[in-house]
Amino acid sequence: MTCPNNQAGNSFFVDSLINVRPDSGSYYQSNGVYLPPGSEFSYGLSGGSCFPGIGKRNEPSAQSVISSPAPYVQGMETWLEASRPCRVDQPRGQHMAQCSFSPNIKEESTYCLYESDKCPKGATVDDISYSASSCPVTSTFPVPGYFRLSQTYASSRHYHDAHPNTDHFTLQQSARPDSRSSHRQAASAEPEQRANREESPVCAPCVPVREEDSRLSSEGSSSPEPAETPSLECPEKSGKGDGKNETAANWLTAKSGRKKRCPYTKHQTLELEKEFLFNMYLTRERRLEISRSVHLTDRQVKIWFQNRRMKLKKMTRENRIRELSNSFSFS
């Protein structure tokens, strides 16, 4: 701890405190302060000094706070307030040294390397806090520490040049509006092409049943869910009547509003449902006959009946639980 305010008072105060003997008390006539020996009090003088933070000048300063004086040392307190030989408190004007870290970051975001009319990209790259007034009008450049690659990557070779070539920038400015206009024309042409495609829709030919069967057999074997819902047909088949279109929409829409998986057509599902009403379990011969009649493979018919039996079991379980919950009130 250094005492910069009063050097004469500092030397007298420190030397007088260092010369105090720990075994006997000391008395200062000028101030009327009596310092008892260290043996009487445990919190008294340690090592012959009044404060633990004050030592010899050659020793390193100890980082400790000055404790408040005892009630019998009131004269010492007034003596410290009068001359102020060693004070830890700083004047109110110097609260805290201003940190230079955050202003540097702020200046970095607001620096403009070139003039505003020569660097049109600076406005898009800069932060929201960027203002036109912060951009210098002169051709002088700031310290290289504020050099930003994002602003001057394309024209970095003009950084060391005192007079950059203005023709390069004017050519770039004249070329940019042309490119923007071409982009706008291309963007306006895309909706027209989409509208033309919507006006003349081409109906994709229906996939042959055999190819669809080979594709759906793998799906049916991997999914245990019931798959009796029909798939979308061609517009020629589905466009026979408005009532049939509404029923097809009901078939294709699940309770949650999503589209169902439709590996089977409506005709195939109806035939399989009729057979399931007569017999839940099929023999191999009957399964082969049904597969030929509905144009499905033997494996697809087998998987459909398995899924339909699981669905029936689930529905009966839910109905039983609903009946029990209605008969017994759990309130």
Swiss-Prot record:
Pfam families hit by this protein: Homeodomain (PF00046)
A GO CC term attached to the entry: nucleus
Organism this protein belongs to: Takifugu rubripes (Japanese pufferfish)
Role: Sequence-specific transcription factor which is part of a developmental regulatory system that provides cells with specific positional identities on the anterior-posterior axis.
Record field: compositional bias (Polar residues): 167-176
GO molecular function, one term: RNA polymerase II cis-regulatory region sequence-specific DNA binding
Main localisation: nucleus
Region (Disordered): 158-251
Protein's name according to its UniProt entry: Homeobox protein Hox-A10b
CDD domains (alphabetical): homeodomain
Keyword Lipid metabolism: no
Keyword annotations from UniProtKB, A to Z: Developmental protein, DNA-binding, Homeobox, Nucleus, Transcription, Transcription regulation
Subcellular location field: Nucleus
Family to which the UniProt record says this protein belongs: Belongs to the Abd-B homeobox family.
Compositionally biased tracts (Low complexity): 217-233
Compositionally biased tracts (Basic and acidic residues): 191-200, 234-245
Top-level taxon of the source organism: Eukaryota
DNA-binding region (UniProt annotation): 257-316
